[in-house]
Design a protein with these regions (language model features):
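Preference for long, well-ordered alpha-helical segments
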Residues: 95, 99-148
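Carboxylate-rich helix-loop segments that flank metal/cofactor sites and access channels
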Residues: 57-107
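Surface-exposed helix-capping loop/turn segments at secondary-structure junctions
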Residues: 31, 61-62, 119-120
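Alpha-helical scaffold segments that form or flank carboxylate-/histidine-based iron centers
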Residues: 3-14, 34-53, 92-96, 121-135
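Conserved alpha-helical segments that form or flank metal/cofactor-binding pockets of metalloenzymes
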Residues: 36-73, 140-147
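Alpha-helical bundle segments that constitute or directly flank the non-heme di-iron/ferroxidase center
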Residues: 2-32, 94-117
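A structural signal for well-ordered alpha-helices, especially hydrophobic packing surfaces
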Residues: 19, 26, 52, 59, ...
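N-terminal/domain-start segments enriched in small and hydrophobic, helix-friendly residues
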Residues: 4, 10, 77-78, 148
């Protein structure tokens, strides 16, 4: 597997995890009565879906096939969110705590992707997406502080 294909596949899985995780977090925030946080989580879910589609299309242009099913780590993270909800309820603060962890993980994976020997075209996309993921991570941290 080429480095571009491997990196692209890893990022697509991470982004699919984010899409699903933020959709679930949006549901939990809505149930907890916080439409602002819920709306932002739904926005991030849509953003991650768009990022994944961009990478899938880029890979297809190069003749690579990719999977869009999410990773085992992401499934575990979403499972952890479900367990945490069962134990600690579905408070916005609890959901934000999990979202902060998820965003830190996403930033780390994007940074690791940039450490790889990837093509200039893929690097440009990853740099741009990482900047937006970092911005989202900062906003999630700010929301966490406001809802503590």
């Amino acid at each position: 597997m080429s480095t571009d294909k491997s990196v692209t596949q890893d990022l697509i899985l991470t982004l699919e995890d984010g899409k699903a995780g933020f959709a679930k977090a949006g549901e939990k925030a809505a149930e907890a009565g916080n439409p602002e946080v819920a709306g932002y989580f739904y926005e991030l879910s849509s953003q991650r879906e768009g990022f994944a589609k961009e990478l899938v299309e880029m890979a297809a242009d190069y003749g690579d096939e990719t999977e869009e099913h999410g990773s085992l780590g992401g499934a575990i993270h979403r499972g952890w969110m479900t367990i945490k909800d069962a134990i600690g309820g579905s408070s916005v603060a609890a959901v934000l705590d999990v979202a902060v962890q998820g965003e830190a993980h996403a930033v780390k994976l994007f940074e690791e992707a940039l450490a790889e020997d990837i093509s200039p075209d893929l690097r440009r996309v990853v740099v741009r997406q990482l900047a937006e993921v970092r911005t989202a991570a900062q906003r999630v941290l700010a929301l966490q502080s406001m809802n503590a």
